[in-house]
Regions:
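Solvent-exposed segments in extracellular or luminal domains encompassing
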Residues: 100-109, 654-656
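Proline-enriched interdomain boundary motifs that mark the N-terminal boundary
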Residues: 28-35
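Aromatic (Trp/Tyr) and acidic
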Residues: 137-242, 246, 276-312, 348-371, ...
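Surface-exposed, flexible coil segments in extracellular/virion-facing regions
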Residues: 80-104
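C-terminal edge beta-strand
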Residues: 125-134
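Acidic, Ser/Thr
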Residues: 49-58, 70-75, 86
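C-terminal beta-rich recognition modules with glycine/proline-rich loops and embedded aromatic residues
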Residues: 433, 498-506, 511-602, 623-638, ...
Length: 784
């Protein structure tokens, strides 16, 4: 917030007549900007980076197609700046209250307001920022449940998983095997040619983007996870899984042959490169020299793919796992404090992957074997500075409090920061990642759980700028799920799982069509474009299925004496190492169509531990309010006996000695809800969204005129339609004009239109874009 108080400054022409244009008056006003609101986790301090000057400060990044800003205005007298505490329950100590860049320290938790004052002797300007000071984080954190062999028995998820396994992943395999793609080239052929070069044989050039290896690694991971799903006799799934096994047998030797002797692996650095004009650059290409070469992006996906491949083989095939350690060791050998190289990558997948991989190596091997990878993650994040907002290098990581720049890079970076905060117990990392989470969820978050409004190159826009025709890239939804999940691991609070459920069921689940043959790169809430089979930048194609199919990881978390239930999906999975035993968990539920959930707890032997069940909260984000209320758990029984469990951090806690066959039954309230946004979001004023449980709904032109208006209190009902879109709960109502209204879940939107011709594929980001089509499916309905 900024407040301007002072004198207008006028410009004069040669004759002495004043020429106070509106732009000049705006650009010459004395201005103070304190900076973003933030969270401080004790005993951390907060970093203040204020601005005092005339007019708005220069931005590091301009929005897409924004004209070059005018030159800076002639300043008035040099202003004097000063920081002060305006309100709060305890003292605030500024390192230097007269410096724009300084720190503030707190001793007491609570809500504070800090003020920055600018004074030039003629005028004064003020700006404030809010600080929430919180107590230190818990000393321990939740532990991951690795996705291993599991079974899905959910009507919704069984169909979605089958479409990914039978159609989408095999389609990705076929595309990656092709050497003639014009859109999104650069598949397994790059590894083949790199292997030839390393073997001293004649070879071709690198195809596609420098980061094209990424979707190969993603697809390897997606195949590995898909092979851990019990086909339950489904012949189509069995056939598709056989294709995946054969593909892995074919691809893995080719990938390993492309790894350089020191462990480095990225074929764009091994092979000559050819640009769009056919010009060949033979190399050599120096490692860790150009931040835009996506070295960490590619490497991080390889580490994650190796992790899940190793699990899929029950730790019997260590080829990719050992190669991933060799690659990570290569980075550790070259990147780090002097005499090693100081470095950060332009796309932060390595930062997201390293702690996950390091923990995994420690779990597999012990002895701190993975600790060096965790330390490298922190070093890479610590090196981020002196750059721009686009790749989150505009400030040191611990001084970042507002989500800015490219949304995928941002959520990957923040995901890594959450891991580092937990591993290092660094209060400055805790403060930064809590602040970034708060900024996203309460200022830059779509009702579908998507992020990235697209004003700044596929990125975050200003606070509350949530236009409905952009952007919500599928990869940003994947990254946001990882971020929310890691926040849940760090703080043990159910609200983070509430949010990744929202993103999973809405922004990401509908990124592929119902058949699993086409996908969306973007997921705007107002849309009129059909999905497409491939993309000029197919960065999402493997990311979508690897994230959606990792269900046991999203469903459960654990400590030595607690088992956390975060998602409700009909399924069978085994959680290892709770209460000194392994526990098979069997969920029986038709959620989200029905709120009845039955959990059967099957420990290998009797054991005492706590089962902690997430108590849903549909309104975690402060941007939206839903009515009527549909939070909580309506009733809960254990072996038929009713109980009222304690609620801790959003979880219903049931502590007892568990025996195989013990059953927990509970009911989750599911109601049709109207969702309205706060006034600060201009794009959604006089509009209402609908939801049922975790699902946000759309109305579509194929069913009605979507420009019609709803009365604010008109009756709405949920009705099951088994013949529509594979079987969905629809919301029925009547528009103000008397016409029937039918709303369908957001994830099944745009599944009743024509399938696009591959020749009409969307061009890659950064290129020319086709004119947007009028929306045929919308989330926010006009409200009378």
């Amino acid at each position: 917030m900024k407040i301007l108080i002072g004198l207008a400054i006028l410009f004069f022409n040669a004759a002495g007549a004043p020429q106070p244009s509106a732009l000049q008056q705006q650009n010459t006003a004395l201005t103070a900007i304190a900076g973003p609101d933030r969270v401080v986790v004790l005993p951390s301090k907060t970093f203040l980076n204020g601005y005092v000057g005339y007019g708005d400060p220069p931005r590091r990044e301009r929005r897409r197609n924004e004209p070059t800003p005018p030159p800076p205005p002639n300043p008035g007298p040099a202003p004097i700046a000063g920081w002060s505490k305006e309100s709060g329950p305890g003292p605030v100590v500024f390192a230097d209250a007269k410096a724009l860049s300084t720190t503030a320290a707190f001793t007491a938790p609570g809500a504070y307001v800090l003020k920055l004052t600018a004074d030039n002797g003629q005028a004064r300007a003020f700006s404030t920022l809010s600080v929430i000071v919180d107590t230190p984080p818990p000393a321990t954190h939740l532990n991951a449940v690795y996705t291993k062999n599991y079974r899905i028995n959910s009507p919704l998820w069984s169909h979605r998983a089958e479409s990914l396994i039978v159609n989408w992943i095999p389609h990705c395999i076929d595309q990656i095997n092709r050497g003639d793609l014009e859109q999104g080239p650069g598949g397994i052929d790059n590894f083949v040619e790199a292997g030839k070069k390393l073997a001293g044989q004649p070879h071709g050039n690198h195809k596609g983007y420098v980061f094209s290896n990424a979707w190969v690694h993603q697809t390897v991971e997606a195949m590995s996870i898909a092979l851990m799903i019990d086909p339950q006799g489904d012949q189509e799934i069995i056939k598709a899984q056989a294709k995946m096994k054969a593909t892995l047998d074919d691809w893995i030797p080719k990938i390993l042959a492309a790894q350089e002797p020191d462990g480095y692996l990225q074929t764009a650095f091994t092979l000559p490169r050819i640009d769009g004009k056919g010009v060949v650059t033979p190399g050599p290409f120096n490692h860790w020299e150009r931040r835009g070469d996506h070295e960490g992006y590619v490497a991080g996906y390889f580490l994650e793919s190796a992790l899940n491949h190793y699990l899929m083989t029950d730790k019997k095939d260590a080829r990719l796992y050992n190669a991933a350690k060799k690659l990570a060791d290569c980075w550790v050998s070259h990147i780090g404090p002097a005499p090693k190289k100081e470095w950060f990558d332009g796309h932060q997948e390595m930062e997201q992957a390293l702690v996950r991989f390091g923990r995994f190596v420690n779990d597999m091997e012990g002895g701190g074997r993975g600790d060096a990878y965790i330390k490298l993650a922190k070093f890479l994040l610590d090196c981020r500075k002196n750059g721009g907002e686009y790749d989150q290098s505009h400030l040191p990581a611990v001084q970042q409090y507002e989500a800015v720049g490219h949304a995928v890079r941002a959520v990957y970076s923040y995901s890594g920061m959450a891991d580092v905060a937990v591993e290092t117990h660094d209060p400055e990392y805790h403060s930064a990642v809590r602040s970034l989470w708060d900024n996203i969820v309460n200022k830059k978050y779509y009702v579908t759980g998507g992020v990235g409004s697209g004003e700044t190159s596929e990125g975050f826009g200003p606070n509350y700028s949530l236009r409905q025709n952009a952007y919500c890239e599928s990869c940003s939804s994947c990254g946001l799920i990882f971020l929310q999940y890691k926040m849940n691991m760090a703080y043990g609070e159910a609200k983070y799982a509430d949010l990744y459920e929202e993103t999973l069921f809405n922004a990401l689940l509908g990124s592929t069509d119902l058949e699993g043959k086409n996908f969306y790169y973007q997921n705007p809430l107002d849309s009129g474009t059909p999905r497409y089979p491939w993309h000029g930048c197919p960065c999402c194609v493997g990311n979508i299925p690897r994230t959606l199919l990792m269900l046991p990881t999203w469903m459960y978390a654990k400590t030595v004496d607690s088992l956390y239930v975060n998602l409700f999906v009909g399924s069978t999975a085994t959680i290892e190492g709770v209460g000194g035993t392994d526990v098979q968990m069997v969920q029986v539920t038709d959620y989200p169509w029905d709120g009845n959930v039955s959990l059967t707890v099957n420990p290998v032997r009797q054991s005492r531990f706590s089962v902690r069940i997430r108590v849903p909260n549909r309104s975690v984000s402060g941007l939206y309010a839903s009515t009527p209320e549909a939070d909580g758990i309506a009733s809960i029984t254990v072996n038929g006996e009713a109980l009222k469990p304690m609620i801790e951090k959003g979880y219903a806690v049931i502590s007892r000695a568990w025996n195989a066959g013990d059953k927990i039954d509970f009911i989750l309230p599911l109601k049709v809800q109207r969702v309205r946004s706060i006034d600060a979001i201009a794009a959604t004023q006089s509009r209402v969204a609908l939801r049922f449980g975790p699902l946000v709904y759309n109305i579509e032109q194929v069913d009605q005129d979507i420009t019609q208006t709803l009365e604010p209190d008109s009756p709405l009902t949920a009705e099951w339609n088994g013949s529509l879109l594979g079987g969905v709960m629809v919301i029925q109502g009547v528009f103000a004009g008397g016409g029937k209204m039918t709303a369908i879940p957001n994830y099944v939107r745009n599944n009743r239109g024509p399938v696009p011709d591959p020749a009409t594929l969307t061009p890659p980001p950064g290129g020319g874009r086709p004119a947007p089509r009028p929306p045929t499916s919308i989330v926010w309905i006009r409200e009378k």
